Amino acid sequence: MLILTLLTLSACGMTMTEKDFENQTPKLVLEDYFSGNLVATGLFEDRFGNIRTQFTVDITGTFDGKTLTLDENFVYSDQSTEFRRWVIEKTGPNSYSGTTENAIGEALGTASGNSFHWTYKFRLNVGDDVWKVKFDDWMVLQPNGVLLNKATVYRWGIKIGTVFLSFRKQAAVEAADGEPARLAS
Protein backbone atom coordinates (compact mmCIF):
# COMPACT_ATOMS: atom_id res chain seq x y z
CA MET A 1 0.00 0.00 0.00
CA LEU A 2 2.87 2.37 0.81
CA ILE A 3 4.49 1.78 -2.59
CA LEU A 4 1.19 2.44 -4.39
CA THR A 5 0.75 5.69 -2.45
CA LEU A 6 4.30 6.81 -3.27
CA LEU A 7 3.84 6.02 -6.96
CA THR A 8 0.57 7.95 -7.04
CA LEU A 9 2.12 10.97 -5.31
CA SER A 10 5.18 10.96 -7.58
CA ALA A 11 2.96 10.79 -10.69
CA CYS A 12 1.07 13.87 -9.47
CA GLY A 13 4.30 15.85 -9.43
CA MET A 14 5.18 15.10 -13.06
CA THR A 15 4.76 18.00 -15.45
CA MET A 16 4.94 17.87 -19.23
CA THR A 17 7.71 20.06 -20.68
CA GLU A 18 8.80 21.16 -24.15
CA LYS A 19 11.77 18.77 -23.83
CA ASP A 20 9.32 15.83 -23.90
CA PHE A 21 8.55 16.69 -27.56
CA GLU A 22 11.94 17.77 -28.95
CA ASN A 23 12.41 14.63 -31.09
CA GLN A 24 8.78 14.19 -32.12
CA THR A 25 7.69 14.64 -35.73
CA PRO A 26 6.33 16.14 -37.85
CA LYS A 27 8.03 19.34 -36.76
CA LEU A 28 5.62 22.17 -35.93
CA VAL A 29 6.73 25.52 -37.35
CA LEU A 30 4.05 27.85 -36.06
CA GLU A 31 4.33 30.48 -38.81
CA ASP A 32 4.19 27.82 -41.55
CA TYR A 33 1.26 25.92 -40.09
CA PHE A 34 -0.86 29.00 -39.38
CA SER A 35 -0.20 30.83 -42.67
CA GLY A 36 -3.26 30.72 -44.88
CA ASN A 37 -6.81 29.65 -44.08
CA LEU A 38 -7.63 27.15 -41.33
CA VAL A 39 -10.74 25.75 -39.70
CA ALA A 40 -10.89 24.75 -36.04
CA THR A 41 -13.53 22.91 -34.06
CA GLY A 42 -13.57 22.94 -30.29
CA LEU A 43 -15.34 22.78 -26.99
CA PHE A 44 -14.99 23.99 -23.41
CA GLU A 45 -15.33 21.42 -20.64
CA ASP A 46 -15.74 22.65 -17.06
CA ARG A 47 -13.77 21.14 -14.17
CA PHE A 48 -16.61 18.71 -13.48
CA GLY A 49 -16.47 17.23 -16.99
CA ASN A 50 -19.54 19.05 -18.35
CA ILE A 51 -19.33 20.45 -21.87
CA ARG A 52 -20.37 24.09 -21.53
CA THR A 53 -20.04 25.24 -25.13
CA GLN A 54 -18.92 24.08 -28.55
CA PHE A 55 -17.59 26.29 -31.33
CA THR A 56 -15.97 26.58 -34.72
CA VAL A 57 -13.28 29.05 -35.71
CA ASP A 58 -12.46 30.33 -39.19
CA ILE A 59 -8.81 31.50 -39.12
CA THR A 60 -6.76 33.52 -41.57
CA GLY A 61 -3.04 33.69 -40.82
CA THR A 62 -0.36 35.87 -42.41
CA PHE A 63 3.38 35.91 -41.69
CA ASP A 64 5.63 38.76 -42.81
CA GLY A 65 8.96 37.20 -41.78
CA LYS A 66 8.74 38.25 -38.13
CA THR A 67 5.08 38.71 -37.20
CA LEU A 68 2.33 36.11 -37.47
CA THR A 69 -1.16 37.66 -37.46
CA LEU A 70 -4.14 35.39 -36.84
CA ASP A 71 -7.66 36.70 -37.53
CA GLU A 72 -10.07 34.35 -35.75
CA ASN A 73 -13.84 34.34 -36.27
CA PHE A 74 -15.63 32.24 -33.63
CA VAL A 75 -19.18 30.89 -33.89
CA TYR A 76 -20.46 29.34 -30.65
CA SER A 77 -23.19 26.70 -30.21
CA ASP A 78 -25.62 29.42 -29.02
CA GLN A 79 -24.95 31.22 -32.36
CA SER A 80 -23.06 34.08 -30.69
CA THR A 81 -19.92 35.23 -32.51
CA GLU A 82 -16.59 36.68 -31.53
CA PHE A 83 -13.62 38.11 -33.44
CA ARG A 84 -10.09 37.89 -32.05
CA ARG A 85 -6.81 39.00 -33.61
CA TRP A 86 -3.58 37.52 -32.30
CA VAL A 87 -0.31 39.28 -33.19
CA ILE A 88 2.54 36.85 -32.55
CA GLU A 89 6.20 37.87 -32.79
CA LYS A 90 8.90 35.32 -33.51
CA THR A 91 11.46 36.24 -30.83
CA GLY A 92 13.99 33.45 -31.47
CA PRO A 93 14.41 30.23 -33.44
CA ASN A 94 11.76 28.48 -31.31
CA SER A 95 10.33 31.25 -29.12
CA TYR A 96 7.31 33.50 -29.58
CA SER A 97 5.39 36.23 -27.79
CA GLY A 98 1.84 37.22 -28.61
CA THR A 99 -0.84 39.74 -27.79
CA THR A 100 -4.55 40.04 -28.35
CA GLU A 101 -7.14 42.50 -27.10
CA ASN A 102 -8.19 40.58 -23.97
CA ALA A 103 -4.73 39.28 -23.07
CA ILE A 104 -3.18 40.65 -19.90
CA GLY A 105 0.43 41.25 -20.86
CA GLU A 106 2.11 38.94 -23.35
CA ALA A 107 1.61 35.29 -24.13
CA LEU A 108 4.98 33.53 -24.13
CA GLY A 109 5.59 30.31 -26.00
CA THR A 110 8.13 27.78 -27.21
CA ALA A 111 8.00 25.37 -30.14
CA SER A 112 9.70 22.01 -29.67
CA GLY A 113 9.51 19.10 -32.11
CA ASN A 114 5.83 18.64 -33.00
CA SER A 115 4.57 20.84 -30.14
CA PHE A 116 3.98 24.43 -29.14
CA HIS A 117 3.44 25.43 -25.52
CA TRP A 118 2.45 28.84 -24.32
CA THR A 119 0.95 30.47 -21.27
CA TYR A 120 -0.91 33.71 -20.86
CA LYS A 121 -3.36 35.64 -18.72
CA PHE A 122 -6.65 36.64 -20.25
CA ARG A 123 -9.83 38.61 -19.53
CA LEU A 124 -12.59 36.07 -20.21
CA ASN A 125 -16.22 37.10 -20.67
CA VAL A 126 -18.43 34.84 -18.53
CA GLY A 127 -22.05 35.92 -18.75
CA ASP A 128 -22.17 39.56 -17.65
CA ASP A 129 -18.86 39.18 -15.79
CA VAL A 130 -15.22 39.40 -16.84
CA TRP A 131 -12.88 36.91 -15.16
CA LYS A 132 -9.10 37.15 -15.10
CA VAL A 133 -7.86 33.67 -15.97
CA LYS A 134 -4.63 31.93 -16.92
CA PHE A 135 -4.25 29.61 -19.92
CA ASP A 136 -1.69 26.78 -20.07
CA ASP A 137 -1.92 25.92 -23.75
CA TRP A 138 -0.38 22.91 -25.56
CA MET A 139 -0.60 22.26 -29.31
CA VAL A 140 0.63 19.01 -30.86
CA LEU A 141 0.88 18.44 -34.64
CA GLN A 142 -0.26 15.00 -35.81
CA PRO A 143 1.20 13.14 -38.84
CA ASN A 144 -2.07 13.71 -40.79
CA GLY A 145 -1.72 17.51 -40.52
CA VAL A 146 -4.32 17.94 -37.75
CA LEU A 147 -3.11 20.18 -34.92
CA LEU A 148 -4.59 19.18 -31.56
CA ASN A 149 -4.83 21.83 -28.85
CA LYS A 150 -5.50 21.39 -25.13
CA ALA A 151 -5.66 24.54 -23.01
CA THR A 152 -6.17 24.25 -19.27
CA VAL A 153 -7.84 27.33 -17.78
CA TYR A 154 -7.21 28.50 -14.20
CA ARG A 155 -8.80 31.18 -12.02
CA TRP A 156 -7.13 32.05 -8.69
CA GLY A 157 -4.86 29.05 -9.27
CA ILE A 158 -7.79 26.64 -9.44
CA LYS A 159 -8.55 24.74 -12.65
CA ILE A 160 -11.94 25.87 -13.97
CA GLY A 161 -11.91 23.89 -17.20
CA THR A 162 -10.23 22.79 -20.38
CA VAL A 163 -10.52 23.94 -23.99
CA PHE A 164 -10.05 21.25 -26.65
CA LEU A 165 -9.45 22.30 -30.27
CA SER A 166 -8.62 20.59 -33.52
CA PHE A 167 -7.13 22.70 -36.36
CA ARG A 168 -6.99 21.75 -40.04
CA LYS A 169 -5.90 23.63 -43.14
CA GLN A 170 -9.01 24.74 -45.02
CA ALA A 171 -7.75 23.10 -48.24
CA ALA A 172 -7.54 19.75 -46.39
CA VAL A 173 -11.09 20.18 -45.09
CA GLU A 174 -12.36 20.95 -48.60
CA ALA A 175 -10.52 17.97 -50.06
CA ALA A 176 -11.98 15.63 -47.43
CA ASP A 177 -15.52 17.00 -47.72
CA GLY A 178 -15.53 17.78 -51.43
CA GLU A 179 -16.83 21.30 -50.76
CA PRO A 180 -15.67 24.58 -49.13
CA ALA A 181 -15.47 24.55 -45.34
CA ARG A 182 -18.15 26.60 -43.64
CA LEU A 183 -18.72 27.89 -40.16
CA ALA A 184 -21.48 26.33 -38.10
CA SER A 185 -24.83 27.93 -38.81
Please place each PLM-identified region on the residue numbering.
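A short, Trp-centered hydrophobic/proline-enriched beta-strand micro-motif
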Residues: 34-42, 149
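Amphipathic hydrophobic-ligand
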Residues: 51-57, 130-135, 159-163
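C-terminal motif of bacterial Sec signal peptides marking the signal peptidase cleavage site
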Residues: 8-11
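Bacterial signal peptide processing site
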Residues: 13-15
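Central antiparallel beta-sheet cores of small beta-barrel/beta-sandwich binding domains
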Residues: 41, 45-126
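Surface-exposed interaction patches
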Residues: 106-109, 115-127, 131-138, 142-151
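Glycine-rich, aromatic-bearing surface loops/beta-hairpins
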Residues: 136-185
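N-terminal helix-cap/turn-to-beta initiation motif at the start of protein domains
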Residues: 21-37
